[in-house]
Amino acid sequence: MPRRRVIGQRKILPDPKFGSELLAKFINVVMVDGKKAVAEKIIYGALDILAEKSGKDRLEVFDTILDNIRPMVEVKSRRVGGSTYQVPVEVRPVRRNALAMRWLVDAARTRGEKSMSQRLAAEMLDASENKGSAVKKREDVHRMAEANKAFAHYRW
């Protein structure tokens, strides 16, 4: 590990339609093979479907959805004296957002609707009601951390 200077994180430009950095990050998560225009079309389409069904502001609903998916704790493997323990650790805020977005997109990709916009909108709708695959993933991670609470003193 280099001991020189800490490299700062790049500043992400806000998305063109809503001016939200979080939404711009989500567009980058959805993007495949560098096709940003396609990713934007998918997300804006999903947000339109979501706004139509819920009747609320798009960004407000998006923030609520991410809040329902964000993990607070996760487990990390730690080797102590020949055995590996799953140690629960708190998740940093940037990683919370990244995991929530990744889980949301993964859950949407496994759904059965026709277009990706419809799949994403359906998964977002489920997440806003605290159900769906992405929320289940968060609950599984929390359950795993709760089960291994006894090893919390191995934290580093």
UniProtKB/Swiss-Prot annotation:
Gene Ontology biological process terms, A to Z: translation
The entry's keywords: Ribonucleoprotein, Ribosomal protein, RNA-binding, rRNA-binding, tRNA-binding
MF terms (GO), sorted A to Z: rRNA binding; structural constituent of ribosome; tRNA binding
Entry annotated with the keyword tRNA processing: no
A Gene Ontology cellular-component term: small ribosomal subunit
CDD domains: uS7_Bacteria
Record bears the keyword RNA-binding: yes
Tree of life domain: Bacteria
Family statement drawn from the similarity comment of this UniProt entry: Belongs to the universal ribosomal protein uS7 family.
HAMAP family: Ribosomal_uS7_B
Quaternary structure, from the entry: Part of the 30S ribosomal subunit. Contacts proteins S9 and S11.
NCBIfam families for this protein: rpsG_bact
Function (record text): One of the primary rRNA binding proteins, it binds directly to 16S rRNA where it nucleates assembly of the head domain of the 30S subunit. Is located at the subunit interface close to the decoding center, probably blocks exit of the E-site tRNA.
The name this protein goes by in its record: Small ribosomal subunit protein uS7
